[in-house]
From Swiss-Prot:
Purpose of the protein: An accessory protein needed during the final step in the assembly of 30S ribosomal subunit, possibly for assembly of the head region. Essential for efficient processing of 16S rRNA. May be needed both before and after RbfA during the maturation of 16S rRNA. It has affinity for free ribosomal 30S subunits but not for 70S ribosomes.
Record keywords, A-Z: Chaperone, Cytoplasm, Ribosome biogenesis, rRNA processing
Gene Ontology terms for molecular function: ribosome binding
Protein's UniProt name: Ribosome maturation factor RimM
Organism ancestry: Bacteria, Bacillati, Cyanobacteriota, Cyanophyceae, Synechococcales
Name of the gene this protein is made from: rimM
Organism: Synechococcus sp. (strain JA-2-3B'a(2-13)) (Cyanobacteria bacterium Yellowstone B-Prime)
Domain remark text: The PRC barrel domain binds ribosomal protein uS19.
């Protein structure tokens, strides 16, 4: 699976086995915690798996001491099996996207958008850093990085249909990255 396979949403990653009964510790990559606590279909995929494999969620809970979720999935009965899934991606079909509020976006929809500053193409959204406040990572045509906080005042226009967003950073911010 490519990191941006349009058929799947990455919601978490298995970071460790937990206990002896097949529980997994999962780092959350979703804004929807119910993906880790409400039973239902989930898929796991390791780098060596050609396709995601169905492993329905039986139960899950937040593990505050580590900032992770503990999940129990069908087909993973013990620690030995659980350890084979460390590093795997936890996925749901893209059709399972949960509804967003106005002016909220799925990360995957922002990646690849053209970024315009003062009417000129600045670059392309290449990543999003979750640092308390989301920060757009923009790669310019000469492969330099520009970081701009993803807030309405600095990113007033996001047009998914046109594949573009417009930024209005404070004076000097872009130049500080470009030299």
């Amino acid at each position: 699976m490519m990191a941006r396979d349009p058929d799947w949403l990455l919601v978490g990653q298995v970071v460790a086995a937990h206990g002896l009964r097949g529980w997994l510790r999962v780092r959350c990559w979703s804004d929807f915690p119910e993906r880790f606590t409400e039973p239902g279909p989930r898929w796991l995929q390791r780098d060596t798996d050609p396709e995601p494999l169905l492993h329905p969620l039986i139960e899950g809970q937040f593990f505050p001491a580590k900032g992770l979720y503990l999940v129990r999935l069908e087909g993973i009965p013990n620690r030995t099996v659980a350890e084979t899934w460390v590093g795997a991606r936890l996925l749901v079909p893209a059709s399972h996207r949960l509804p967003l509020q106005p002016e909220e976006y799925h990360y995957r929809d922002l990646i690849g958008l053209a970024v315009y500053h003062q009417g000129e193409l600045l670059g392309q959204v290449s990543g999003i850093l979750a640092a308390g406040q989301d920060v757009l990572e923009i790669t310019t045509s000469d492969h330099r990085q520009v970081l701009i906080p993803f807030v309405k005042a600095l990113v007033p226009v996001v047009d998914l249909e046109k594949g573009a967003l417009h930024v209005q950073p404070p004076p000097g911010l872009v130049e500080s990255f470009l030299g």
